[in-house]
Amino acid sequence: MSLVCSVIFIHHAFNANILDKDYAFSDGEILMVDNAVRTHFEPYERHFKEIGFNENTIKKYLQCTNIQTVTVPVPAKFLRASNVPTGLLNEMIAYLNSEERNHHNFSELLLFSCLSIFAACKGFITLLTNGVLSVSGKVRNIVNMKLAHPWKLKDICDCLYISESLLKKKLKQEQTTFSQILLDARMQHAKNLIRVEGSVNKIAEQCGYASTSYFIYAFRKHFGNSPKRVSKEYRCQRHTGMNTGNTMSALAI
């Protein structure tokens, strides 16, 4: 799968010309680099270690976080951060690049931690979303950052620096629409919340619905069952699983 960006940990200072501009990079500095300009750093690879991030990792990170979207006039091609515990970061990157990386959940948390170093940087979200390969993917990632927000087509266009007519055209080429992407994202989030949240009112609110009754209508139309029915099915599945586990334990004794 294609890389979206890389996090680079500089262990030896160097000077470089990136995109026709001279830069001085310091020992211990951390960079997030758009994959489109990654080749500009290749001549200096002996000065740094890095970890790459593919589209799936970026999508999941954006879904799991709640970072506000901030538009910037010109999308950054790389971001810089400092005052990071370099010893810890060095060990994290070494582990993520090693063959010992066999604990998926732990590795994923480390990857998310590397990305979060840049969360306060202006242009962070723009860099990530611009790296997602499809237009529908970019829209989905923006929506997933805050599903409770009353998203409008104009909001998405502002984030992507694109006109409403052009965005509609591009989404049509990918056989989808903004409304469909928003609905799918909210319904999937609702289905996940039902596993842990008992209040339909709260779920509706967290998914961006001002009206609980309309949320229930939309959920039933999307999944064929009401939220309460799906919640009950999940509880039954958990109960059955627990009983099976207890039976197996008793047999083992």
UniProtKB/Swiss-Prot annotation:
Q: Does the keyword DNA-binding apply?
A: yes
Q: Does the keyword Transcription apply?
A: yes
The Swiss-Prot or TrEMBL record marks DNA binding at: 154-175, 200-223
* Induction line: Induced by EvgA.
GO terms for MF: DNA-binding transcription factor activity; sequence-specific DNA binding
SMART domains of this UniProt entry? HTH_ARAC
Q: Which SUPFAM superfamilies match?
A: Homeodomain-like
What residues does the HTH araC/xylS-type domain cover? 137-233
Q: Which UniProt keywords apply?
A: Activator, DNA-binding, Transcription, Transcription regulation
The record's annotation in InterPro entries points to: Homeodomain-like_sf, HTH_AraC, HTH_AraC-typ_CS, Tscrpt_reg_AraC-type_HTH
Q: Which cysteines are joined by disulfide bonds?
A: none
Source superkingdom: Bacteria
One of its Pfam families is HTH_18
What does this protein do, in the record's words? Induces the expression of gadE. Could also regulate the expression of other genes involved in acid resistance.
Q: What is this protein called?
A: HTH-type transcriptional regulator YdeO
